[in-house]
Amino acid sequence: MPAQGPSHGELPPADAGRESSPYLELDRSAWAALASEVENPLSAEEIRRLRGLGDQLDLDEVQQIYLPVSRLLSLYVESAGRLYRAQEEFLHQDQPPRTPFVIGLAGSVAVGKSTTARVLQEMLAHWPQHPNVALVTTDGFLYPNAELERRGLLERKGFPESYDRRALLKFVVDIKSGKDEVLAPTYSHLVYDVVPDEKVVIRRPDIVIVEGLNVLQPARVRDDGRTGLTLSDFFDFSVYVDAKTSTIRDWYVSRFLRLRETAFQDTGSYFAKYATLSIEEAMAEAERIWDTINGPNLAQNVLPTRSRATLVLRKDRDHSVRYVRLRKL
């Protein structure tokens, strides 16, 4: 699947090539003004705890960008609740309990989507209407390394085919079916593998955030020409964290060099072999991994799903969000 737009991943203007657009686009100052009178519930210490390696997240970014996002999401959740009650009244019968509101969050490796997911989880839980917010990453649904090796997919880890897509879809379907308890597998970034027999238990939260590279992938076409269900069929809202591809590549290389000095020093790390590399060798290896795995996956599978998102957060080189694009209702 070809990447959409220019090769560097620049978003065209919302009204490019047409008189009107299905998107609203707001620059940073216009977006920040939407929550200027809402108090930021997170302290500087909490923000430091939520920040990922290399992210420049600070109080200003949370106040100006993520507070309006959390308020918008809260409005969507409240609206879904009103629709649930209206449907119950229309049917003249009691319905099963309302199912969790599911948010899909996508974006490239190293773009900061995990930090975005953690911040939104924390902020959404501060709104009194929905205090119970669960976060699940799709990493746990990767096939174990042994299975990836057996299939010849270890060098394509992160590509759509490296995930147990049937299990991931069943997980989200179970959430939206209102099951009292749903289990998700656990992934260890230290050992770079799924943790056997370790599960995350999801017990009917108000909101579930599903974060991962490929969560906005369209349904696959089957051999008989039919298409089945896909994850985004069960999302109530979706977010894509975006930046120029060349910028994300630089962030990935910088993060790799930081990990070489930190997590890779752990002898139990899958990547411990990189700890002894010189800076030049580590940089060359990071660039190789990006150019052969992460970059192609972004171009072929992740970036083309950007237009499927309800909300796009476009970042600048300093990691700050420059503008926001929201799909019109």
From Swiss-Prot:
<dbReference type="GO" id="GO:0005737">
    <property type="term" value="C:cytoplasm"/>
</dbReference>
<comment type="pathway">
    <text>Cofactor biosynthesis; coenzyme A biosynthesis; CoA from (R)-pantothenate: step 1/5.</text>
</comment>
<dbReference type="InterPro" id="IPR006083">
    <property type="entry name" value="PRK/URK"/>
</dbReference>
<keyword id="KW-0808">Transferase</keyword>
<protein>
    <recommendedName>
        <fullName>Pantothenate kinase</fullName>
        <ecNumber>2.7.1.33</ecNumber>
    </recommendedName>
</protein>
<dbReference type="InterPro" id="IPR027417">
    <property type="entry name" value="P-loop_NTPase"/>
</dbReference>
<keyword id="KW-0067">ATP-binding</keyword>
<dbReference type="GO" id="GO:0005524">
    <property type="term" value="F:ATP binding"/>
</dbReference>
<keyword id="KW-0547">Nucleotide-binding</keyword>
<keyword id="KW-0963">Cytoplasm</keyword>
<dbReference type="GO" id="GO:0004594">
    <property type="term" value="F:pantothenate kinase activity"/>
</dbReference>
<dbReference type="Pfam" id="PF00485">
    <property type="entry name" value="PRK"/>
</dbReference>
<feature type="binding site">
    <location>
        <begin position="107"/>
        <end position="114"/>
    </location>
    <ligand>
        <name>ATP</name>
    </ligand>
</feature>
<dbReference type="InterPro" id="IPR004566">
    <property type="entry name" value="PanK"/>
</dbReference>
<keyword id="KW-0173">Coenzyme A biosynthesis</keyword>
<feature type="region of interest" description="Disordered">
    <location>
        <begin position="1"/>
        <end position="22"/>
    </location>
</feature>
<keyword id="KW-0418">Kinase</keyword>
<dbReference type="GO" id="GO:0015937">
    <property type="term" value="P:coenzyme A biosynthetic process"/>
</dbReference>
<comment type="similarity">
    <text>Belongs to the prokaryotic pantothenate kinase family.</text>
</comment>
